[in-house]
Design a protein with these regions (language model features):
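N-terminal export leaders
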Residues: 4-10
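Carbohydrate-active catalytic/glycan-binding domains of CAZyme proteins
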Residues: 1-2, 20-556
Length: 556
């Protein structure tokens, strides 16, 4: 009987095959970043950018004495981060408008599709958020009683294009957005701005659409990609501000005005009202690609603009994405001015004349460091992954982040077991402790730095040729990994993984029993830049795990 039982157990083991990979356990995640430009703001100054790293396409609104801001998030989840501030300098993230899988489905989307250019506004005790889910449903509106959420599921809006924005006038509302022109496009990038009334009580469009700008400031000059429009009214004029030139180094902000909401709109003779494209590219620590602005009036009557811009470390090279900046707006001769032509965007400027508050909020600008011990009930809201998960990707237990992954980075069919934080500085050191034993060929767990589905790196533990090893692998706008460096390791011992980033290069080191060894130094990581990888996002860095066979499901 005992022999029969033993034989049965051996047969079962043979059928089951080799032992499966256990989960990866990460602890003590640390980030320490500093700006390449060393600026010392004065006591009455603030620092640009106000939101460092991948926080593009800012939309701002004021409710009483409080300001709210939302950014694009593309195919990252949770998405559409929402911030609150009382002084427009110290910002605290209070939620993500997309924080439930049943709101949107990002399955099959590449990292730079999904959530484009949201706009936030407030009316009759309700917040409104309009945006575009590119390749996943089109234009939509969501509502919430509290900007922190919960936000509703999307109500889909039946018009094409991107970048919708709501303009409120009394009890009426209008949506302005980028669409195809009324005529056949004359050139690449020929777009138009349209306006249509929005019934905010039923969340539906009403009446006909009117094209109010065709092409841009001067269609004879073939202006490209007029987008990101916003309307406001001042002293009897309707003002339309919009981005022009595409969200690269030719980006700009332009303005038009009209006596009637449906036009005709006249462009300002002094356009653009914001751009850095005429400045010398080789200037020290440049700010480039400025545009996609939205204006807000303070309770004291002053005007300010939030907008996106970038901080390249080389010729149009930036890994951290497009960031949120702030500048005052001056009105002269009936037109708004954000920055005079030929002037550089300042890294430090006089702060808005508002009461300084919330100075204990987690820093979003300048040099800063943080540490996550994973000892809370959930990850903080600034951790993000790729695409909407069909099931939970992680669990937190005993001060550790636990990952079991069945979808690999680069596989668009699902959400990889990757959770990360935005890289917010070109000079940064990121580290974590890892405990992991790979059992199946190709199993891996470690740190990943992800710019796109075809451009990322992995630094961690894997199994190759039947043996565990530490490996640095890169994918450079490709569907295949390239091994950069490897070293044998003992998987029974916890590892300290450290990535030190410095612009377009990086150093990779690991620690065992308190001793650090450099695996690779001066590694070229320019492939993580937007210029090389393409798209609209910034690099996200964090724990990642993958196995073809998973021992247990994630439970929470």
């Amino acid at each position: 009987m005992r022999k029969t039982r033993r034989a049965a157990l051996l047969l079962l083991a043979a059928i089951a095959g080799p032992a499966l990979a256990g989960p990866a356990r990460f602890s003590d995640f640390r980030y320490d970043g500093r700006a390449q430009e060393q600026v010392t703001p004065g006591p009455d100054d603030y620092r640009n950018p106000i939101l460092s790293g991948y926080y593009p396409d800012p939309s701002i609104t004021r409710v009483g004495d409080t300001y709210y801001l939302v950014n694009s998030s593309f195919a990252h989840y949770p998405g559409l981060p929402v911030f609150r501030s009382s002084d427009m300098v110290h910002w605290r993230q209070i939620g993500n408008a997309i924080d439930r899988p049943d709101q949107f489905d990002f399955s099959g989307l590449r990292s730079s599709r999904g959530m484009f250019a949201p706009d936030i506004s407030f009316h009759d005790e309700l917040f409104y958020l309009v945006g575009t889910c590119v390749d996943c449903g089109g234009n939509f509106v969501m509502t919430a009683k509290d900007a922190a959420g919960p936000w509703s599921k999307p109500h889909w809006l039946p018009f094409e294009g991107i970048d919708p924005s709501i303009y409120w006038e009394g009890e009426r509302a209008f949506i302005v957005n980028n669409r195809a022109p009324a005529e056949p496009p004359r050139y690449e990038g020929h777009r138009a701005i349209w306006v249509q009334e929005f019934d905010w009580r039923t969340l539906t469009m009403t009446g006909g659409s009117t094209q109010i700008v065709n092409g841009g400031v001067d269609i004879r000059q073939k202006p490209a990609w007029i987008e990101g429009p916003h309307l406001l009214k001042r002293e009897g004029f309707y003002y339309l501000i919009a981005a022009e030139g595409g969200t690269g180094d030719q980006h700009s902000e332009v303005v038009f005005r009209a006596r009637d909401l449906r036009g005709p709109f006249t462009p300002y003779a002094g356009n653009p009202i914001l751009s850095q494209r005429s400045l010398a590219p080789a200037r020290p620590h440049p700010v480039t690609s400025a545009g996609h602005a939205k204006l807000v009036q303070t309770q004291a009557g002053d005007w300010w603009a939030t907008f996106l811009a970038t901080r390249p470390y080389g010729p149009d090279l930036y890994n951290i994405g497009r960031e949120t900046f702030l500048l005052p707006v001056a009105w002269r001769d009936g037109w708004p001015h954000i920055l005079e032509a030929g002037k550089t965007i300042p890294y430090a400027a006089k702060r808005p004349p508002l009461p300084v508050c919330d100075i204990d909020a987690p820093p979003t600008s300048g040099d800063f460091a943080y540490r996550d011990r994973f000892d809370g009930p959930r990850l903080s809201m600034d951790w993000i992954g790729l695409r909407t998960p069909k099931a939970p990707l992680y669990r937190l237990e005993a001060g550790a982040l636990v990952l079991d992954g069945t979808t690999a980075l680069g596989d668009l069919s699902g959400a990889p077991a990757f959770v990360g934080r935005r890289q917010q500085h070109h000079v940064a050191t990121i580290s974590t402790d890892l405990t992991y034993r790979p059992e199946t060929e190709g199993d891996r767990a470690g740190l990943a730095a992800v710019q796109s589905d075809r451009s990322f790196l992995f630094f961690g533990v894997t199994r190759k040729d039947g043996k565990p090893q530490l490996a640095l692998m890169v994918r450079e706008d490709s569907d295949h990994d390239r091994l950069v460096a490897a070293a044998p390791i003992d998987p029974a011992k916890p590892l300290r993984l450290t990535i030190a980033l410095d612009g377009g290069t990086a150093r990779f080191a690991y620690g065992v029993d308190g001793r650090e060894t450099v695996l690779a130094r001066d590694v070229d990581i320019r492939f993580l830049s937007t210029h090389e990888a393409g798209g609209f996002v910034g690099t996200v860095v964090g724990p990642y795990a993958w196995s073809a066979r998973v021992t247990r499901p994630i439970s929470n």
